[in-house]
């Protein structure tokens, strides 16, 4: 019984790693991490009443999500450097 299965290893900048069955699930996990990371930075800037930083971080976050989504539509591995890396693996 040599069945192969594809899984996607999602590695986060905080050192956490998870495996997902399905590329969409891997992308979803990565996108959620990117959103959470940028939302924390936005909240920190908002607490300091730094509107320019809030705007700038929001724009950067949207760019990061867009780049991550664009990278995910290609075959194979994709990442949002340095926050998330997704590696396609075959498991036997």
PLM features per residue range, with description:
Residues 13-32:
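A short, exposed loop/beta-hairpin motif centered on an aromatic-Gly-Thr core
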Residues 36-92:
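Short, mixed-charge low-complexity intrinsically disordered segments
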Residues 2-16:
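Short aromatic-glycine-(Arg/Gly/Cys) micro-motifs in beta-strand/loop hairpins
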